[in-house]
């Protein structure tokens, strides 16, 4: 056997590439010792990471299961079929495509399947909690299509379905997008369906943020009401980073399959698809429902305690995992708040709030999410303590003693709720 010294295929990562191994180790330490409150992040299980870090990364498999352009696909066919069946069972869908590399790719495939350049679409304004792919002018969705953006009511900071209906009647969109990246309230998918039917529009639900809550029955499902549903597979679903498309109509299914491949992607990432299958299997277990219920209870506890400390929360609370702070109530910008909590090892992100006078690079809001820390085992009491730390830091930005105490409390919480305790990163095995 030839020994290729330049290709140490059996060497562990720490030996083969110590620089990358060291950086991965540092990132793991950061995740263990910081409080993760970014609403779009979560912690995948060791099983999910093991599947994603497997030999499946070696296999090329253009096409759909049992309709490949390459040989040797019998095992990845079985894996992808299992991922599809689990996704359908989890969300009550008639069809699923598990190949999109991301939620943005899933949305793009839907646009490619249903629309032509110049068609009119409606989506939630980014500054009101929407997403870049819902018609933002900096995204391809805002460049290819005529975009009509709807927003929330200025007083209630909630979706005004009658105002949305009037916009739809005026502009007659070909497709309406319902979904968000920073909207803390329940979405009435049935009301969106009625509007879409009235104007003859397709209805796309982007449930990327709430997919796990939908799977667990904690948030109403869009699947019975929408022509097509897209999602990411991480966030509240707690899987690998990736995308998913669901629908209930065989005619649409063929269009979406072709829009994914060959329309917008080449070979699927079968190692990621295997990890998706594992995550879907985990979400089908009874424990996942209890987890998702706790995610919402924790968000409500976080919001309540922050409001009690005098910090406004957009819409006055939350129905899901998102808590969006309106920092105008304490005379602070999101940019400053982001840096302040980061100094005490709390990870969040600045975010626009409805009718925000600040630029997207500054903002008046701070977006928080409870999915990741709930995975660590945080309960409502622990989140009330997290809220106290955040409030202490934001309300006393110049007090070094309070900053030091906040750091101590964060460290204590991290020790009480360890993440991958005593586990070995798959990449380092």
From Swiss-Prot:
Please give the residue positions where the record annotates the modification N6-(pyridoxal phosphate)lysine. 235
Going by the UniProt record, its keywords in alphabetical order are: Amino-acid biosynthesis, Cytoplasm, One-carbon metabolism, Pyridoxal phosphate, Transferase
Q: State the needed cofactors, names only.
A: pyridoxal 5'-phosphate
Q: Site: Plays an important role in substrate specificity. Where?
A: 234
- Enzyme class per UniProt: transferase
Which molecular-function annotation in GO is an example for this chain? pyridoxal phosphate binding
Is the Cytoplasm keyword given for this protein? yes
Which biological process terms from the Gene Ontology are attached to this UniProt entry?
A: glycine biosynthetic process from serine; tetrahydrofolate interconversion
State its location(s): Cytoplasm
Similarity comment text for this entry: Belongs to the SHMT family.
Q: Give the function comment from the record.
A: Catalyzes the reversible interconversion of serine and glycine with tetrahydrofolate (THF) serving as the one-carbon carrier. This reaction serves as the major source of one-carbon groups required for the biosynthesis of purines, thymidylate, methionine, and other important biomolecules. Also exhibits THF-independent aldolase activity toward beta-hydroxyamino acids, producing glycine and aldehydes, via a retro-aldol mechanism.
The protein here is known as Serine hydroxymethyltransferase
Q: Organism, per UniProt? A: Synechococcus sp. (strain WH7803)
User: What lineage is this protein's organism placed in?
Assistant: Bacteria, Bacillati, Cyanobacteriota, Cyanophyceae, Synechococcales
Q: Which gene encodes it?
A: glyA
């Amino acid at each position: 056997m030839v020994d290729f010294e330049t290709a140490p295929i059996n060497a562990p990562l720490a030996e083969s590439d110590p620089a990358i191994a060291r950086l991965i180790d540092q990132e793991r330490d950061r995740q263990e010792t910081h409080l993760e409150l970014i609403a779009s992040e979560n912690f995948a299980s060791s099983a999910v990471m093991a599947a994603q870090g497997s030999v499946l990364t070696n296999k090329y498999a253009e096409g759909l299961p049992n309709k490949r352009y390459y040989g040797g696909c019998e095992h990845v066919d079985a894996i992808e079929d299992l991922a599809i069946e689990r996704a359908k069972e989890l969300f009550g869908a008639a069809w699923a495509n598990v190949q999109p590399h991301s939620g943005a790719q899933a949305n793009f495939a839907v646009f490619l399947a249903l629309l032509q350049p110049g068609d009119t679409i409606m989506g939630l304004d980014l500054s009101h909690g929407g997403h870049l792919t819902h018609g933002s002018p900096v995204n391809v969705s805002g460049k290819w299509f005529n975009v009509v953006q709807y927003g929330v009511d200025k007083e209630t900071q909630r979706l005004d379905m009658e105002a949305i209906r009037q916009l739809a009647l005026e502009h007659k969109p070909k497709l309406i997008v319902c979904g968000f990246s920073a909207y803390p309230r329940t979405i009435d998918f049935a009301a969106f369906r009625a509007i879409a039917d009235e104007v003859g529009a397709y209805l796309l639900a982007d449930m990327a943020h709430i997919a796990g809550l939908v799977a667990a029955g904690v948030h109403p499902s869009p699947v019975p009401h929408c022509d097509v549903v897209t999602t990411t597979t991480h966030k509240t679903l707690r899987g690998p980073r990736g995308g998913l498309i669901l629908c209930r109509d065989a005619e649409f299914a063929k269009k979406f399959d072709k829009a994914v491949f060959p329309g917008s992607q080449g070979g699927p990432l079968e190692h990621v698809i295997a990890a998706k299958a594992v995550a879907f299997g985990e979400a089908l277990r009874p424990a996942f429902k209890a987890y998702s219920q706790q995610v919402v209870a924790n968000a409500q506890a976080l919001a309540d305690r922050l409001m009690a400390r005098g910090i406004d929360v957009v819409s006055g609370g939350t129905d899901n995992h998102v808590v969006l702070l309106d920092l105008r109530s304490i005379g602070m910008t999101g940019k400053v708040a982001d840096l302040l909590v980061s100094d005490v090892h709390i990870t969040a992100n600045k975010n626009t709030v409805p009718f925000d006078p600040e630029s997207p690079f500054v903002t008046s809001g701070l977006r928080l999410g409870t999915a990741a820390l709930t995975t660590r085992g945080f309960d409502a009491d622990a989140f009330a303590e997290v809220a106290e730390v955040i409030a202490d830091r934001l309300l006393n930005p110049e007090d070094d003693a309070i900053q030091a105490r906040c750091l101590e409390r964060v460290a204590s919480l991290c020790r009480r709720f360890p993440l991958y305790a005593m586990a070995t990163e798959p990449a380092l095995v």
